[in-house]
Amino acid sequence: MKRQRTRRGLGGSAIAAVMVLTLAACHSTPAATSIHIDLNCVYNGVPGPEPVPDQPGSITVTADSPRWATEGSVIPVVRNSTYTDVDLPISGEVFAFLDVEGGTWNGRIVNNLPALDPATDATVDITESAPGHVAIGVAEVWVVKFVVNRPVSFMCTPTSTPPALADVQVRKNPS
């Protein structure tokens, strides 16, 4: 398992994160007990491999104490010079508020894409840029709702084996 690392951010523009609900195949933590925020594949809005040290615009994760996310918790994602992977325990439904800025994130989202199609949900600015891929508009705040006890994966590794489809809702924060 990767070492948990959380710390208070010192500011800077937030950028998109790729979020993965931890799966037993990759981590010893049971899938229903943590959200894995995978920062290996996005820097400066561009997918890239791990590790990419000292890349301007690469990101780390901060979380307030207590170090678990419950319903309504805010998980800030800020610019930093190093990559960090963080496993956060979860309870119930988790809403992660991501301030997305600085480019377009082209990442692979394994979920029910039709439910997130702008043609059927005007509150979501998501367009399919390639089969199984989406482009998410930036400079907006998004709410990502994870429903626990269902395998959910946000990933951008082309060779990843996707888990079963699950309920994921992405909505623009109205405030």
Kindly give the residue locations of the regions a language model identified.
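Secretory targeting and sorting signals
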Residues: M1-T29
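Primarily mature extracellular domains of secreted and cell-surface proteins
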Residues: P30-S175
